[in-house]
């Protein structure tokens, strides 16, 4: 099994939970904190150099995504978040249960409210605040609707957690909610009881 601990930047090394999967080719540098059951996929880059990056639990950062910071602008990614292929999140806050679509860009100082979807290719401008449960499309990004789609995003995040855990045999009795391909089915402990 591939084991990755991250690279130091000015003496600061990443803090990566033992229950995290990091694919070969991914780069995690500096002040980066990654929560339990999250996954970082091929060639994704997280660079915590002039501020910190925090990634919550059960979150997946997909292939070629880039997370970076700016002075006084950390990059904070919540729990149960999917950051799609080639997406960029720069010095911004993404709250829990969000989906950042493929090749979307979230610029410095932006805040993405809980349960929101940023569509593929969308551009969230500097300091733009997206309300919770919003769908954002276009360049520049505009809220086109709000909806209660948190459950769908949550299921997507759980699907990634479950798939990497099973494929790599890392957590045969993985804790937390499970996704059976259609719905959230509770915890593995619930199933055992």
Regions found by a protein language model. Name each.
Residues 2-40:
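N-terminal segments that cap or nucleate solenoid repeat domains
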Residues 1-11, 15, 49, 55-57, ...:
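Glycine-rich hexapeptide-repeat left-handed beta-helix
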């Amino acid at each position: 099994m591939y084991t990755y601990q991250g690279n130091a930047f000015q003496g600061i090394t990443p803090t990566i939970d033992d229950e995290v999967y990091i694919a070969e080719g991914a780069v995690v540098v500096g002040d980066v904190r990654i929560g339990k059951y999250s996954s970082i996929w091929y060639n994704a880059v997280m660079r915590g150099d002039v501020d910190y990056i925090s990634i919550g639990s059960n979150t997946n950062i997909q292939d070629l995504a880039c997370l970076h910071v700016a002075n006084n602008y950390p990059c904070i990614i919540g729990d149960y978040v999917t950051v799609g292929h080639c997406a960029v999140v720069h010095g911004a806050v993404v709250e829990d249960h969000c989906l950042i679509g493929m090749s979307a860009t979230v610029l410095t100082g932006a805040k993405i409210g809980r349960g929101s979807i940023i569509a593929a290719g969308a551009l969230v401008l500097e300091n733009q605040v997206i309300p919770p449960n919003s769908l954002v499309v276009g360049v520049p990004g505009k809220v086109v609707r709000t909806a209660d789609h948190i459950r769908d995003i949550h299921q997507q995040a759980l699907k990634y957690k479950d798939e990497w855990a099973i494929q790599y045999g890392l957590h045969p009795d993985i804790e937390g909610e499970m996704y059976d391909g259609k719905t959230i089915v509770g915890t593995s402990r619930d199933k055992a009881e």
